[in-house]
From Swiss-Prot:
Basic and acidic residues bias (residue ranges): 211-226
UniProt-recorded name of the protein: Uncharacterized protein R506
Region (Disordered): 196-273
Biased composition (Polar residues): 248-273
Residue stretches of biased makeup (Acidic residues): 200-210
Amino acid sequence: MTSTGLSTNKPIIKALNISNVVISNVVVANKLRNKKAPIHYNDGKLVFQTPYLTANSILVQTSTPNIYQFDTVFKGKSKKRCKELFDFIDTLESDIANKIIRNGMNWFTTSDISIKSLIRQNNDETFFIRWLLDLSSCVFIDDSKNQINPHESLDVKDLVRFIVEVKGAFVQDNKIGLAVIVHKIRVKKPEPKDKVVPEYDFDSESESDNSEEKRFVPVLETEKAPHSKNTRIIQTNQSREYDLDYNQPKNPKQTTLKNTLDTRSKNNSNTTKQIFEQDDIFSDDDNAEQLVAKISPRPERSNKSKHKIADNFGYGGFFE
């Protein structure tokens, strides 16, 4: 996908798919400019595109002129791509923080350094991103690539994808966070689900039909009592008990989400994979919103230089 402008004279910058971003090629400057460390990628800008995410709010104006915000949750057209974005942001933030710590420890006053993650968490433990937008430069387009007015066209539950530039990393008060700019947003309306209403009809016009009675009599006559107290009666349509915390069927052998997250601190390499594959938090069915709202908090991460790195401080973006 490429960014398109109103003028054909503008240079076109291709936004990378996150699967094509080589994080080891991300370079962090060793000097601060206005409390930000500039970031480059292969001697150019780090610009990537997100998969489709679900809008969880409409545009809300901030106290700064032309600056608006709205939220997206990690649910969209593809569960796999939403998981990839979650992993990408998590890995990118950790990598940049480690590079800053190695190259600029004189920027901090303590060895306890925190990450203010783009990935936030609300009171019901839903992971989401709060995007800050400068509407004087950010362009909204529809699925046909026509420019639209977001105040009129952006609704909750719309599918949205972003072209994002990681401009740098801000370093302030012993915290590190990505300074990102949203250049373009593509809005796609969710496909309506047609509800099929069945038509009902009488089986027969006659009220003297004894076929039902005749059909059930042989069944009653052949019914027998169990042979012993140990005989098991299997109820094939037995109802399942649901755990209210996760809205999933209980299974004694199933690993709980809490236990999965407890293992994350022991094995960082496979944790988000466990989180996203165990509970179908991106289900497209009617219960998807309930399921996505029950993920436990992301635990602390440790880097190689033994500095404490904690996230989820609620940083949702940066604008200039």
